[in-house]
């Protein structure tokens, strides 16, 4: 998905303020229109857009004796993803926007954020509080460490997305800048800031990141992917 398509979708979308409203009162036969109502005669939950809920409460104020509204976003352009479509392990607190691809057996940990247009390969783990920016492409059997940032490239639209090839480990709190390609079977050390392409089969570290060694048997042992964590 290119940046221009995403930008047009955001521009043209009807901005919404999704909300959940808890209501009490004489609710039997309450006409909620396009809003979703779940409840009984004297208590229920209304789910929908904030403005529509406000209008309903104003219209039915004599019947609704009490209410509380929880706002989930404000003028949001795009919804969150439907998590049921993924054959992956997605833990509570992960935030995944719509139009994200996630491969079978991937693991998305608590607090991870994945933006629109990103692609997560099969068996890849996105660890706690990692941020995967828009249009970033991450291959199969990778591990993106806790707090790592893979830069997104929706703005400016001409920017090239980050590409991380298969079997790559990105250490905790590392940063991969826009347009960088990380070659297969490589390691980005914790805290590194990657500003240039990483050759396949290498280990990079530092700020800015530089090649410090080749990927060898010792490195392979220390960065081994555990398949049991990816079983569904």
From Swiss-Prot:
It is an enzyme of class 2 (transferase). The keyword Amino-acid biosynthesis applies. Disulfide bonds: none annotated. The keyword Repeat applies. Its EC number is 2.3.1.89. It catalyses: (S)-2,3,4,5-tetrahydrodipicolinate + acetyl-CoA + H2O = L-2-acetamido-6-oxoheptanedioate + CoA. Pathway: Amino-acid biosynthesis; L-lysine biosynthesis via DAP pathway; LL-2,6-diaminopimelate from (S)-tetrahydrodipicolinate (acetylase route): step 1/3. One of its GO terms (molecular function) is tetrahydrodipicolinate N-acetyltransferase activity. PROSITE patterns: HEXAPEP_TRANSFERASES (PS00101). GO terms for biological process: diaminopimelate biosynthetic process; lysine biosynthetic process via diaminopimelate. Keywords: Acyltransferase, Amino-acid biosynthesis, Diaminopimelate biosynthesis, Lysine biosynthesis, Repeat, Transferase. Belongs to the transferase hexapeptide repeat family. DapH subfamily. NCBIfam families: DapD_Ac (TIGR03532). Catalyzes the transfer of an acetyl group from acetyl-CoA to tetrahydrodipicolinate. This is 2,3,4,5-tetrahydropyridine-2,6-dicarboxylate N-acetyltransferase.
């Amino acid at each position: 998905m290119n940046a221009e398509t995403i930008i047009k979708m955001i521009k043209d979308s009807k901005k919404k303020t999704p909300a959940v409203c808890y209501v009490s009162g004489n609710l039997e036969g309450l006409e909620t229109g396009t809003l979703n109502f779940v409840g009984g005669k004297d208590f229920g939950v209304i789910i929908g857009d904030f403005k529509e809920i406000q209008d309903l409460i104003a219209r039915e104020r004599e019947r609704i004796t009490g209410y509380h509204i929880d706002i989930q976003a404000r003028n949001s352009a795009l919804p969150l993803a439907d998590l049921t479509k993924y054959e992956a392990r997605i833990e509570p607190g992960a935030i995944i926007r719509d139009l994200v691809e996630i491969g079978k057996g991937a693991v998305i940990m608590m607090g991870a954020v994945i933006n629109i247009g990103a692609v997560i390969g099969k068996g890849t783990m996105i660890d706690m509080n990692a941020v995967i920016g828009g249009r970033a492409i991450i291959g199969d059997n990778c591990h993106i460490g806790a707090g790592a940032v893979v830069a997104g490239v929706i703005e400016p639209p001409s920017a090239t997305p980050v590409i991380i090839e298969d079997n790559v480990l990105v250490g905790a709190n590392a940063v991969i800048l826009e347009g960088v390609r990380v070659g297969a079977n490589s390691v980005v050390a914790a805290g590194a800031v990657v500003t240039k392409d990483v050759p396949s089969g290498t280990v990079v570290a530092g700020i800015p990141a530089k090649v410090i060694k080749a990927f060898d048997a010792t490195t392979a042992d220390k960065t081994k992917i555990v398949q049991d964590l990816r079983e569904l």
